[in-house]
Amino acid sequence: MPLAVKRIANLGQHKAIVTLGVIIKGDTPHFDFVAGECARGIADVTLEYDLPIGFGVLTVNNVDQALARAEEGEANKGREAALAALEMADLLERLS
């Protein structure tokens, strides 16, 4: 995901990006590595391109938890990530 986000950021056509995905924990520590590197990579792109990126990547124990966080309404984590990215883009514009 970080590579795809970097390619989009490199286009220079967006004021913000929103990442959406889910990482479901299995029986090995692989989950921790994938989740951590995904977050770190996206944070690196944010700082490299000075571009707000809403982090809507869910880290859950099972599919039911993912579905609960993706339901319509105020608690939707994708919605929260999009709003955070838009608010940060607005703040950065006001600070420039």
Positions of predicted regions on the chain:
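C-terminal binding/interaction regions
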Residues: 36-96
